[in-house]
């Protein structure tokens, strides 16, 4: 077995230096595989997707001595969002840079630092507990920031086919608000999107009696939908939200009544609602307004919730030990790959660095919070797997 590894900071810098914009992995997972194989991990690289959007996935596992031991999975993504205008960055987004006690680079917060902390925590844990009772696994994908069709969801199907048992999973999403460990996510709302196409009759704007304006037709329905209380939420989730993201209509000419209007919208829904009930209720409003329409629905993910149990207790205790903070359980924010893992794993929790700069110009993490995050992951391993 190799000697103790370099710091999580050094590994984070190596990962940031790889320009892995979705769906590219740019060698990030190969670097991780090299390190984990040295620790006795069985590594499987799984590629999927069409030729013009090839996704790289990784499943790595180190079995424990006990068949009944706790299997803890660390999950993350090696892909990052595009940089945006390079001229607005203070330094090259794919050259890790240090300023004011911060590590800068695309993926620094979301989520290459988390991956580095996971890997080094695993290495240190295996060195200290080479005959650990439970099992340790790592799941990585290069398709989380994109359509997420060929990433974690494909690995989950593969795991199901193999009959793998997972007991708990920590997703390294940047969940912290002001300081590392102050908030973790024990669930996420569901996401249901729709594209509504309302049919009208195109015509000259001076002869409205010979046309049918779809904008005028849909406007009262939209006004009603904005006012609907879809549910009241519950102790774990805020009320379901319905938001319009895009409106499209018109030919660009100022004297033409359009023939159709397109409305893109999204539900972020709690466990008090289902995709089916939301679809039915929205259609009822549209029908009541007498619209001629079609809707294409896309279910991004159903809500999931991990109630307090062995994983939240171990992670919360680790955070308290390392930082002195009592963490807050939350389900706010967007979706993550936790929604896919939750279909095969009874306990899924997200824990990572401060999220204030994610997806932004000059993305960064505080260097002083990298080692504590690694220690949180290692302490959780000790509590569940040793």
Swiss-Prot record:
Chain sites annotated for binding Zn(2+) 1: 77, 110, 173
Active site: 79, 144 (proton acceptor)
Pathway(s) annotated for this protein in UniProt: Amino-acid biosynthesis; L-lysine biosynthesis via DAP pathway; LL-2,6-diaminopimelate from (S)-tetrahydrodipicolinate (succinylase route): step 3/3
Details of cofactor binding: Binds 2 Zn(2+) or Co(2+) ions per subunit.
Enzyme Commission number(s): 3.5.1.18
CDD domains, per database record: M20_DapE_proteobac
Cofactor(s) this protein requires: Zn(2+); Co(2+)
Coiled coil residues, start to end: none
Top EC class of this enzyme: hydrolase
GO biological process assignments: diaminopimelate biosynthetic process; L-arginine biosynthetic process; lysine biosynthetic process via diaminopimelate
Binding site for Zn(2+) 2: 110, 145, 359
Pfam families: M20_dimer, Peptidase_M20
Known catalytic reactions: N-succinyl-(2S,6S)-2,6-diaminopimelate + H2O = (2S,6S)-2,6-diaminopimelate + succinate
Subunit: Homodimer.
Family per similarity comment: Belongs to the peptidase M20A family. DapE subfamily.
Protein name as catalogued: Succinyl-diaminopimelate desuccinylase
Organism field: Methylibium petroleiphilum (strain ATCC BAA-1232 / LMG 22953 / PM1)
Organism classification: Bacteria, Pseudomonadati, Pseudomonadota, Betaproteobacteria, Burkholderiales
Gene: dapE
